[in-house]
Amino acid sequence: ASWYGSGFHGRRTASGETFNSGGLTAAHRYLPFGTRVRVTNLRNGRSVVVRINDRGPCSGGRVIDLSRGAAAIIGVFQSGVAPVVLEVLGR
C-alpha cells in the first residue's frame, strides 16, 4: 500500500466525489466504488476501514492507495509504503 494526499486534495476522484486527504478513503483498481475494506499494515498490525472512491494505484506492485488520513492511522504515512492485507467488508 501507499498513500496520496495533499496534491490531490479537493480534486475529483474517479467516482465523482471531491477528494478529502484527511478522510478514510482509498483507490483500488477494480473494487466497486463504495466498497468498505479493512486494511491491515503487516509491519505493525494496525488496521483501518476505508471506503473505495477512486481508481489506482498507478505504481506497480501496490494493491491500494490510501488517503493521508487512513495512512496516518495505520502507520504508512511516515514510510510511504507498507505491506498490507485487505479484507473486503462489503458496501
Q: Which role does the model predict for each range below?
A:
Residues A1-R91:
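Secreted/periplasmic proteins
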